[in-house]
Amino acid sequence: NSNITIDGKISSDKVWSNVKPITSLTQITPNFGSPISEDTQIRIAYNDFYFYVSVICFDSSPEKIQVGDSRRDAALNDEDSFLFIIDTFNDQQNGFLFGTNSDGKEFDAQINNEGVGNRSSNRQQGGVIGGTNINWDASWDVAVEKGSYGWSAEFAIPLRSIRFSPGKTKTWGINFQRNISKNTEIA
């Protein structure tokens, strides 16, 4: 129930040291089904007000980490980045997408209909790409730290910024993605 200081410094934070990391990411490209080429540690925590995610993106060549456009909601696909979708209703249809790069760029979007989108032109709006609405901007925080190990990021998402069913015992879905540009890798 404690608050986490959002500063990107994960290894020195006592709260994160008590959370077992998720480490098994699988490549989508270039080697579908193979383990991710660089170690990645993801941790999740929450309290009554925030949903927290931390990631340590280890990199054997941190000098090769690439960063692209720094504008909010600019695409993160062609740079070193980390993204996740929270499926608060666990329906595998809708969710909230958050991401960043090693410079701390904010990326967020609302996912509808598995991201497939609405085919009716009268319902499409600017900023909607398929079923991904990048015009949706929540209030949340992210901080990053770079080092000889690679980079790390901490996210704090206010629960009031996302929709979910009330109740104490709810199951949410979550999906993570790490992009490693030097390997043209998505995991």
Could you tell me what each predicted segment is?
Residues 1-187:
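Structural preference for beta-rich elements and adjacent junctions enriched in aromatics
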